[in-house]
Every structure is written in structure tokens, then in C-alpha cells.
Amino acid sequence: MKKVFILTLLGLAGLTLQAQNKKTVLRFPEVNGYQVLKGDFHQHTVFSDGSVWPTYRVEEAYVEDLDIIAISDHIEYIPKKADIPNTDFNRSYEIAKPIADRYGIILIPAVEITRRMPPGHFNAIGIKDANAFEQFVNKEDRSDTTGLTAALEEAHRQGAFVFWNHPPFQTPENKPTWFPIHEELKNKKLIQGVEVANGRYDKEVFQWALDYDWTIFSNTDVHTTITPRKAVDKGKTSLTLVLAKDRTEESVMEALRDRRTVALFQNVLYGRKEHVEPIVANSINAKMITLNGNYFLEVENLYHFPYEIEILGISEGYKIRNRTFTLNGGEAIGTTVTREKPKSEPVIALRLKLKNVYITPEQNLEIEVPVR
């Protein structure tokens, strides 16, 4: 009776989502011919150690306005096996795929390759057959690391993309630690990316991604519904932005291999300058309003992501009062400007620091915005 009750609740939750079809919208501008898609590449269901049915992951992704998800259930860790006897590790993807197609969500087949630390856990996304990874698992000790390299090599044989999950997990003092095995995997090019944020942000891991030319991820690793995680994060989103040529699985995988991603965690962006700068520059608009000899500067956020802004400077001949402010999505903030040196046709630019946009662990993005 208990099992039936739980599954019924999960089914009702899914029906509720379908009935409402209501989402929290988070939009970014197109940049340099790329669409900015929103993805979560690390999720679980009841087919490993999660607590929701695969279709719920898709319905929830729609409500959260995600474009891409990867259900990456464990091969090695299946605590619900007695209740959900399943020998096909592709099953969670197969169940979710028709619903994903219906909602317009890009669902990428994936698996989490799970070993004790070192070396830890790795996601292989874009796989062809999850069942092929079971042969590398020690049935007597499912966290045994001896088959790890072979499993990652199998992922690459299948054309998958491999990234390192939550590097601090199960390490001494819960800190990111670089072990000799990680150097070996890096040198063999078996790791292509890393989660700089998963429940928390780690600046050391962000630096690794920059140093080793890895793709940058921020994922939820959600096991239950997303609601408890959002409560911990105070409602702020954790996801990976993907700069894709178009809205297809092929374009997403191509973007991951070309490292065109940005991590979004608790309303902060972490990424390479060439990726975050055009997103910000195409989101912020500035104009000067003049009336009866008075000057009023208005800065507007054209999209949904909030920016913490510090005005570092304005063109010579002008002074500005309000220099630090939060610019929420769809909002505009105005401030008085004093003109010191009269010009017939003023050409003005703002120099801005984005205090919640990082291009290195210690450096915020700085841009120049023209004033119309």
C-alpha cells in the first residue's frame, strides 16, 4: 500500500504540472548568432537514488524554464531496486523522452559513473547505451575504482561528453582536491568539463576549468523535487547556460565540446569573458534624457537576469551620483548627471563593473556601454 501511495503522489504531482503549464520565465539575449539555452545536466530519478518518476523531471524542467536536461542515474547505486526491479539502465531516458518531445525539452541520454574519491563521480552525456557501463562495475564493491578509466573510455567510444561532478564531495575537509588520478585522466583527455557549482560554488574548481580549458557547468544534482533546493538557495537558480547554434541536441553537444557555456549559481555568472561579455552587453541599455538643461541617465535591463552594477566611470565632462545598484530583470534605474563641459553633440559611454559576473575567480567583468 505504501508503494502505491508514493507513486500515486508522484503521478498527481505530474498531473498538476501538466494542468497548470505555468513557468517561471528566464530569458537571455541571442549573442553573436548563438541562442543562450538553459540546461541542467545532472539529475536523478527513482531508477537510482532519486525520489521522482522520470516524467516529473521533464515537467519540472518546463516549469523552471529549462531548455535542456540530462537524467544521469547511477549504474552503481540503486537503493530502490527491491521496489523498482529494473535491469535496463536506459529505461529512465526512454520513459521521459516522449514527454520531453511534447514539452519541447531537449533530453540528453546520460549516466553518472560513480566511484569513491579519488577519483569521484563523472557524468557521461550523449551516450548511446547506458547498459554498456555495468560491465565495469565491481559487483562485490560497487564503488571500487578499478574500472573507472575503462568506463570513461567506453563513454568516449560512444561519442559522449564527460565532466567531473562536484569535486569537493567525499574529499578531506570537503574541499576540492587534485589527486594523481585526476592528472592521469586529464592527460588522457578523459575529462572535458567540471561542475564549478553543485550545491555550492568553488573558486578553485573554476580556476581548474580555466587552466585546463574545460567546459564550465553549474548543475542541481536534484534528487527530490526542485522545491527543497530552491528553498536552500533562497529561490535562486542553478543552471548551465549553453551558447548553441540552434535548439537541437546536436548543437548543444557541439557547444559543450567548444566550451561555450556559462555557470549560473545563486544569481551569479561564472564564465570566460568571450561568453559572458556579449550576454551582458546585449542585456543592458543606457540612454540620456535631457529636459530644460537637466540630464538624467537611465540604465535598463532588457532581459530577466539581475545584475549587481557599479559605475566605474562616465565620459569626461560628466559627473554621476548613484554609482552602485541592483538592476533586476525588466527594470530601469535613473540617476541625475551633471554636465561640466558643454558640448554640442555629447558622445557618452559608461564603464561598468558587473559585481555578480566573474571571468576569473577574483575578477569581475568590466564593460563599456554606449549611452544613446
Q: What is each model feature region?
A:
Residues A160-F163, P167, T177-H182:
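His/acidic metal-ligating clusters that form di-metal
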Residues F47, Q170-E173:
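Short, small-residue-enriched loops and turns at beta-alpha junctions
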Residues L15-A19:
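Sec/Tat signal peptide C-region and signal peptidase I cleavage site
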Residues K23-F161, N165, R200-W208, G330:
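A metal-dependent hydrolase metal-coordination microenvironment
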Residues K2, Q20-D40, V58, G120-K128, ...:
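Charged catalytic cores and adjacent phosphate/nucleic-acid-binding surfaces used
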Residues V4-A13:
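Sec-dependent N-terminal signal peptides
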Residues V111-R115, P168-T171, V222-H223:
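Short glycine-enriched loops at secondary-structure junctions
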Residues T8, D73-H74, N198, D246:
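Residues that line or immediately flank small-molecule/substrate-binding pockets and catalytic motifs
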